[in-house]
Amino acid sequence: CAAVERLALMEKVEGDDIFLLKTAALYHDAGFVHQYSSNEEIGAALAKEVLPRFGYTDEQIEVIHQLINATKVPQSPKNKLEEIICDADLDYLGGDEFHIIADKLKRELMERNMVQTDKQWDELQIKFLEQHRYFTKTAIELRRDNKKARIEEIKARLKTYKD
């Protein structure tokens, strides 16, 4: 939620739009409670169910629904707010907390038998990092160099594995 607010402010987004972005950020991973993959639709449905009780309008809920669904990978945002939530969702790829979050994700995937080895994990990371792109000018400027450094770091590590 902090990343979405930071990016929104730096992108000159104000008022209700920041409120909607922060709400979408809170709900966008809520579907993980029910299932691991393709959880965005569940989070969006949960938001649709709960938010009317807190005075959200149908129009606001529809925007939140679209924002949540925009975070599905591969991401294809259709407007500025969707670009912001997509960049915030994967902000860590170029952030200082990359190793901490990547390690947690690696453990999740290993527990689900989606990767079995460090080499498989690094190959998956390289593929994801190279296919990913930031959309907002702010995220590109803030995260591009760190993300590039992570790619080079992982590529170097991949060269050390023995097959």
Label each PLM-derived region with a short phrase.
Residues 37-38, 98:
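Hydrophobic alpha-helical membrane-insertion segments
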Residues 9, 29-30, 48, 52:
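Charged, amphipathic alpha-helical interaction segments
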Residues 3-4, 39-54:
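An active-site-proximal "capping" alpha-helix that borders the catalytic cofactor pocket
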Residues 2-15, 27, 56, 73-163:
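Divalent metal-dependent phosphate-bond-processing catalytic cores, especially two-metal-ion Mg2+/Mn2+ enzymes
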Residues 16-34, 43, 64-72:
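His-Asp-centered metal-binding catalytic motifs of divalent-metal-dependent phosphohydrolases/nucleases
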